[in-house]
């Protein structure tokens, strides 16, 4: 199945990438999925294969991405197969009447972002750090001509394949890559999304320049990241952990982040949303049983993390490549 997917992916991306770039990204993808796969990949693929096959209705333009109808398949068998892909972090989904209540309400983020986007109709889109692909499917449903999601987490790719199993004709592709692994020659995309990635990067300016390089002239960047309150000189670098995460490096103020974007050559920079992350938006569920945001906050003061830093606050900025 993975070989078939990679072949279809290569055909689907031929109009987007030069032969040199396509060859490089597909070689790295094959290495990670076929030649030197993750040790749990056979188990995940067995769970995927246990899902029913064949065409069904898919509703991907709504908050809960819905595959099939209740009663169309054996719900217990579907649930057992989907449980083989736990933890589910980004969603929500419903497969044949089985709700998959993911850790994140990714639909809430989409509701904050979508009103401020240029029309996605006919656009070529890159979604960096795409997770399970939830937002990729929303972008396709909004009319994108091609959506490429990249994320190095192989389980997320298998979760994407669970949806693709029933929507094989949509132009949505997942590559198991990091942004810095895309070849430098770029400029293919009309819109680039980076949501929940920047604070994990040791060099945030390099990440912004990589995003800019992927955009065509006049293309739109949608950047969502953790921020702190303050002026254009304010940035938080945690001493060790932030919200129990060791891989968080820079949390700028919106003003500082705007300056970073401008220094990297973006224009028309604007902040379109800024909001605190609630324990209703990110929490443990039966489909993600590990610790989540409520465990990462000060138990007596949810305005602080366990380390005493300001609790997670996220901003969405939109900018343009001239």
From Swiss-Prot:
It comes from Alcanivorax borkumensis (strain ATCC 700651 / DSM 11573 / NCIMB 13689 / SK2). This is tRNA U34 carboxymethyltransferase. PANTHER family: METHYLTRANSFERASE, TRNA U34 CARBOXYMETHYLTRANSFERASE. Homotetramer. Belongs to the class I-like SAM-binding methyltransferase superfamily. CmoB family. GO terms for molecular function: methyltransferase activity; transferase activity, transferring alkyl or aryl (other than methyl) groups. Disulfide bonds: none annotated. Its EC number is 2.5.1.-. Keywords: Transferase, tRNA processing. Pfam families: Methyltransf_9 (PF08003). It is an enzyme of class 2 (transferase). InterPro entries: CmoB, Mo5U34_MeTrfas-like, SAM-dependent_MTases_sf. GO terms for biological process: tRNA wobble uridine modification. Carboxy-S-adenosyl-L-methionine binds at residues 90, 104, 109, 129, 151-153, 179-180, 195, 199, 314. Catalyzes carboxymethyl transfer from carboxy-S-adenosyl-L-methionine (Cx-SAM) to 5-hydroxyuridine (ho5U) to form 5-carboxymethoxyuridine (cmo5U) at position 34 in tRNAs. It catalyses: carboxy-S-adenosyl-L-methionine + 5-hydroxyuridine(34) in tRNA = 5-carboxymethoxyuridine(34) in tRNA + S-adenosyl-L-homocysteine + H(+).
